Amino acid sequence: MNKVLYIKANAKPEGKSRTFKISDVFIDEYKQNNPDDEIITLDLYKEDIDFLRSKDLDTVFGPKNEESKNHPTLKYAYQFAEADKYVIAAPMWNLSIPAILKAYVDYISVVGIAFKYTQEGAVGLLENKKAVYIAARGGSYAETPYELDGIYLRSILGFFGIKDITTISAEKLDVQGENVDKILEEAIDKAKETAKNF
């Protein structure tokens, strides 16, 4: 049985978020194909996530032991490390990710949990896992230098050792004259197909 962490990062509620329209279908399709897997939903806007403070840094960068698992600053890092698969649903905002998702990444980017330092440099500790990033975007940014949301998430996940990463994006949703329903339908179809083999 695999443990799937479904990370949601959008201030818009269910029903209004175009990103969640796609990601929720992905999760439903995944459940149908993997009924025994555990899916944990983490809605970041419903969590008490703040930016890391100076008092948190010693905990994040210091040595870890059994008691570390009970430290409130490290709870997201341990939860992330315990998962086998990740579904990250977040819209592109201002060419990047929502600030709350970046704050969350800071909480999970923990030495000794997500990666470690060696004489050769940093080494990811989360190998043999996979992730899918699902995003709604107002313009057309896929595979361009402006796709900073996807570039960043693929980079940080790769830094953790996660190399199997798929991006599903609905592009041009705010471009005048585009058929938004058709764009979303195509992204949902891709989400369904991706979920079958995820």
From Swiss-Prot:
| InterPro entries hit by this protein | Flavodoxin_fold, Flavoprotein-like_sf, FMN-dep_NADH:Q_OxRdtase_AzoR1, NADH:quinone_OxRdtase_FMN_depd
Matching Pfam families: Flavodoxin_2
- Among its keywords, does the record have Cytoplasm? no
The Gene Ontology terms for molecular function here are: electron transfer activity; FMN binding; oxidoreductase activity, acting on NAD(P)H as acceptor; oxidoreductase activity, acting on NAD(P)H, quinone or similar compound as acceptor
Its UniProt entry gives the catalysed reaction(s) as: 2 a quinone + NADH + H(+) = 2 a 1,4-benzosemiquinone + NAD(+); N,N-dimethyl-1,4-phenylenediamine + anthranilate + 2 NAD(+) = 2-(4-dimethylaminophenyl)diazenylbenzoate + 2 NADH + 2 H(+)
Give the cofactor note: Binds 1 FMN per subunit.
Q: What class of enzyme is it?
A: oxidoreductase
Q: Which residues take part in binding FMN? A: M92, W93, N94, L95
Which keywords accompany this UniProt record? Answer: Flavoprotein, FMN, NAD, Oxidoreductase
Cofactor(s) recorded in Swiss-Prot or TrEMBL: FMN
Q: Which Gene3D superfamilies match?
A: 3.40.50.360
Q: What is its EC number?
A: 1.6.5.-, 1.7.1.17
Cite the record's note on assembly: Homodimer.
Q: Which PANTHER family does its entry note? A: FMN-DEPENDENT NADH-AZOREDUCTASE 1 (PTHR43741), FMN-DEPENDENT NADH:QUINONE OXIDOREDUCTASE (PTHR43741:SF7)
Tell me which family the UniProt entry assigns to this protein.
Belongs to the azoreductase type 1 family.
Role summary: Quinone reductase that provides resistance to thiol-specific stress caused by electrophilic quinones. Also exhibits azoreductase activity. Catalyzes the reductive cleavage of the azo bond in aromatic azo compounds to the corresponding amines.
Q: What is this protein called?
A: FMN-dependent NADH:quinone oxidoreductase
Q: Source taxonomy lineage?
A: Bacteria, Bacillati, Bacillota, Clostridia, Eubacteriales
